[in-house]
């Protein structure tokens, strides 16, 4: 051992702090490795909380630590950090070294998710066994954790802690060191093959404490009933040593899983979920896209972990269960017992509160990953990627029934989102296509319908079983001991699932019922309308590309800058985007028809109705509005029409055209000078201009062509709503010289003067010719324009 080992722990910590910021990461890690190897646990105990904070950052987000969430593989520090934090690396070696002793570390309750924090403050111990025997009386506001628990709590908290990262740090979340570490820890502590590697140090004190045994005379409280056992009654000073040696095998696995689930998913209790249905309630927590992606990684691995259950352990025979290892037993119950309820409430919140944009794809894929466990079985015969013709094996019918709400209720939630989303956008169209493709898998819709039929079974058969007692965690049991009696039928399981999540008085809306079918038909109409809009945008972009050619720069094209599509439609769509939108929406229509058994006649009728409305020019009308003193006000229907690109306002400048902001293609000095000249002329000759424009002969036509009259403004205002004050404002005929300040006009004049100079024309003769040619050109243009109007 190094000579400095005789120093007091405070000196070791002080020395580390003094040199920490002055050394590069690789040197710090090298020295830490040496310290972990050379020093005993008694001296390492003092530096452990400080080291965890230096790596993961502070819980309040002020200190960012190693920025694992932004540390990308291309960074030089990436491999150093990954090697140090590996499950078999120096940091975990330190954890195990401290775990072999009876050291405890404090974790503030204030940094726990809201429902857990509220429960503890109310004197009710959370259902999760992770928190048993972690709190002391009198209440200190702290959890007392062993080293492994403390490490994992800080690791999980760093994902949701608000951190002020330096600007300019960008990268893919799925390539970050944090994301890769989560995947590494899941594969190490929840292995699909073999067992969890043993700790390198003797450990008899690190096991998860078993909850107090539950009395068998506790009555069953019904579907979804919650235990209100008091905190004082549950806190007993039990030994942390588990009497069963086989359970030593998975204590780290169960701890890691419970920490991840509680810290990442348990942000909304069932009661809070019910309250959040009201828009007046402020949401307590909003996950980030990165947070959701990590949750999806957790869901995918748990499905893979659960599907690796040995065939002999899948048997429902009690004798088979009695011979299962603790890890195999964990695989059996991991999804239903640990994840289902909290993930359902988490996804419900995201479906209801996430912005209506393409970032919802992360939430969507998390949901689709959970409801397709058959994708993660590793079956060689079942490895097609989301193949729509792949039949869902019959063995998954029980999973569908026991997770019915995650199929039906969340599908209805997605349907409501889709009807309010801009489906002209290819990214949003892709999400509709993905959901329709998943639910169109053969036999899946039949399984869902079967589950709904089981839920509708009468209650009398269930009431006969009211004496059954389930040792669930909320009634004092542990996660691994909470198995339902083998005689429980499918009806009971489905009803228990629905009532436990939605409450005894829930009004279940059938996914294949008449109300939902109406919503599906409405979505199909919106999809058809979005296809029409995409086609119109494509045609418009083609037309604008032709008008904005090189020749149009010289004046041949239209100078109207208010006629283009507004917003980001043209930027995001493009030819390829329109093509993808059509492809996604066409396939989504086919899949929806398969799911809800719509025949070709019904589909063609819906699409033809949309096409006929579009051909009648409805798409060129204003959105649905009601008049008011301040102009037109959008209705709910009008908002939906704008969101889906069905109708739009023509956004045009409604003020004085001469006072518009100076454009980049105009000379500022000339704009101001010509405005002064035209204002002087209009003030002196305004009445004569009005008389000229009011004539119905040829001179009146020429006057209206050259002078800006009220008729042109009235024509523009038909396309865009205006206030009553703007509508009542009188418009007078006047001369506008602003077009002469355009650089395009100036360049055209320069080229004409150069041409006439080559033909030996002088300055005054060239000016006269230009005026005559311009007058004749405008005269002919006005003549043909009037002819077209009369026809």
From Swiss-Prot:
Domain of life, per lineage: Eukaryota
Cofactor: Mg(2+)
Keywords: Cell membrane, Endoplasmic reticulum, Golgi apparatus, Hydrolase, Lipid metabolism, Magnesium, Membrane, Metal-binding, Nucleus, Transmembrane, Transmembrane helix
Catalyses which reaction(s): a sphingomyelin + H2O = phosphocholine + an N-acylsphing-4-enine + H(+)
Protein's UniProt keywords contain Acyltransferase: no
Class of enzymatic activity (EC top level): hydrolase
EC number: 3.1.4.12
Bilayer disposition of the protein: Single-pass membrane protein
Pfam family, one: mit_SMPDase
GO molecular function terms attached to this record: metal ion binding; sphingomyelin phosphodiesterase activity; sphingomyelin phosphodiesterase D activity
Residues passing through the membrane, by range: 755-775
Biological process (GO), any one: sphingomyelin catabolic process
Disulphide connectivity of cysteines: none
Subcellular compartments: Endoplasmic reticulum membrane; Golgi apparatus membrane; Nucleus envelope; Cell membrane, Sarcolemma
Cellular component GO terms held in the UniProt record: endoplasmic reticulum; endoplasmic reticulum membrane; Golgi membrane; nuclear envelope; sarcolemma
Coiled coil residues, start to end: none
InterPro entries, per the entry: Sphingomy_SMPD4
Role, per record: Catalyzes the hydrolysis of membrane sphingomyelin to form phosphorylcholine and ceramide. It has a relevant role in the homeostasis of membrane sphingolipids, thereby influencing membrane integrity, and endoplasmic reticulum organization and function. May sensitize cells to DNA damage-induced apoptosis.
Name of this protein: Sphingomyelin phosphodiesterase 4
Naturally occurring in which organism (per UniProt): Danio rerio
């Amino acid at each position: 051992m190094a000579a400095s080992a005789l120093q007091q722990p405070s000196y070791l910590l002080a020395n580390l702090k003094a040199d920490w910021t002055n050394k590069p990461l690789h040197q710090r890690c090298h020295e830490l490795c040496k310290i972990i190897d050379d020093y005993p646990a008694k001296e390492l105990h003092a530096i452990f909380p400080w080291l965890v904070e230096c790596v993961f950052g502070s819980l309040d987000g002020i200190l960012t630590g190693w920025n694992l969430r932004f540390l990308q593989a291309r960074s030089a520090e990436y491999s150093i950090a990954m090697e140090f934090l590996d499950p078999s690396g120096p940091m975990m070696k330190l954890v195990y070294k401290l775990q072999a002793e009876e050291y405890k570390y404090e974790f503030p309750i204030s940094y726990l998710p809201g429902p857990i924090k509220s429960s503890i403050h109310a004197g009710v111990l959370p259902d999760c066994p992770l928190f048993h025997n972690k709190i002391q009386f009198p209440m200190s506001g702290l959890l007392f954790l062993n080293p492994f628990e403390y490490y994992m709590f800080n690791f999980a908290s760093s994902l949701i802690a608000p951190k002020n990262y330096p600007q300019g740090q960008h990268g893919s979340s799925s390539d970050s060191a944090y994301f890769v570490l989560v995947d590494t820890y899941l594969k190490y502590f929840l292995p699909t093959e073999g067992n969890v590697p043993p700790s390198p140090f003797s450990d008899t004190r690190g096991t998860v404490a078993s909850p107090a045994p539950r009395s068998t005379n506790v009555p069953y409280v019904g579907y979804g009933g919650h235990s209100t056992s008091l905190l004082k009654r549950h806190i007993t000073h039990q030994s942390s040593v588990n009497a069963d040696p086989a359970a030593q095998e998975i204590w780290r696995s169960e701890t890691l899983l419970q920490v991840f689930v509680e810290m990442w998913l348990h942000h909304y209790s069932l009661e809070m979920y019910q309250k959040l249905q009201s828009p007046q309630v402020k949401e307590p927590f909003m996950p980030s896209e990165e947070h959701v992606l990590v949750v999806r990684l957790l869901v995918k691995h748990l499905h893979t972990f659960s599907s690796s259950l040995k065939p002999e352990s899948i048997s429902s025979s009690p004798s088979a269960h009695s011979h299962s290892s603790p890890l195999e037993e964990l695989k059996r119950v991991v999804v239903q017992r640990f994840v289902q309820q909290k993930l359902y409430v988490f996804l419900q919140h995201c479906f209801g509160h996430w912005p209506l944009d393409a970032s919802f794809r992360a939430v969507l894929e998390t949901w689709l990953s959970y409801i397709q466990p058959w994708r993660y079985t590793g079956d060689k015969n079942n490895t097609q990627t989301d193949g729509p013709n792949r039949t869902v094996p019959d063995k998954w019918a029980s999973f569908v029934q026991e997770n019915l709400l995650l199929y039906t209720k969340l599908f209805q939630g997605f349907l409501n989102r889709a009807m309010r989303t801009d489906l002209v956008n290819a990214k949003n169209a892709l999400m509709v296509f993905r959901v329709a493709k998943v639910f169109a898998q053969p036999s899946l819709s039949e399984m869902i319908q079967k589950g709904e039929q089981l839920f509708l079974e009468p209650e009398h058969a269930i009431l006969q079983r009211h004496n059954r007692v389930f040792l669930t965690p909320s009634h004092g049991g542990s996660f691994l001991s909470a198995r339902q009696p083998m005689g429980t039928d499918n009806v009971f399981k489905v009803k228990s699932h629905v009532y436990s999540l939605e409450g005894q008085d829930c009004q279940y809306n059938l996914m294949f019922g008449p109300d939902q079918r109406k919503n599906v038909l409405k979505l199909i109409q919106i999809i058809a309308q979005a296809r029409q809009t995409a086609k119109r945008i494509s045609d418009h972009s083609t037309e604008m590309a032709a008008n904005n050619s090189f020749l149009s720069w010289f004046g041949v094209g239209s100078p109207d800058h208010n006629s283009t599509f507004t917003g980001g439609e043209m930027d995001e769509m493009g030819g390829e985007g329109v093509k993808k939108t059509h492809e996604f929406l066409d396939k989504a229509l086919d899949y929806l028809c398969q799911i809800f058994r719509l025949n070709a006649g019904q589909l063609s009728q819906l699409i033809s109705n949309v096409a006929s409305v579009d051909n009648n020019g409805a798409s060129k009308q204003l959105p649905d509005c009601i008049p008011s003193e301040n102009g037109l006000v959008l209705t709910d229907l009008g908002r939906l029409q704008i969101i889906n690109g069905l109708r739009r306002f023509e956004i045009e400048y409604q003020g004085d055209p001469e006072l518009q902001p100076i454009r980049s293609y105009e000379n500022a000095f000339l704009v101001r000078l010509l405005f002064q000249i035209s204002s002087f002329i209009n003030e002196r000759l305004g009445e004569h201009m009005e008389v000229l424009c009011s004539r119905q002969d040829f001179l009146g036509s020429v006057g209206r062509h050259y002078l800006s009259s009220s008729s042109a403004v009235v024509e523009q205002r038909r396309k865009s709503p205006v206030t009553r004050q703007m509508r009542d404002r009188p418009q007078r005929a006047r001369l506008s010289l602003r077009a002469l300040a355009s650089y395009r006009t100036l360049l055209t004049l320069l080229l004409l003067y150069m041409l006439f100079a080559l033909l030996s024309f002088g300055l005054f003769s060239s000016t006269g010719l230009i005026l005559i040619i311009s007058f004749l050109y405008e005269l002919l243009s006005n003549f043909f324009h009037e002819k077209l109007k009369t026809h």
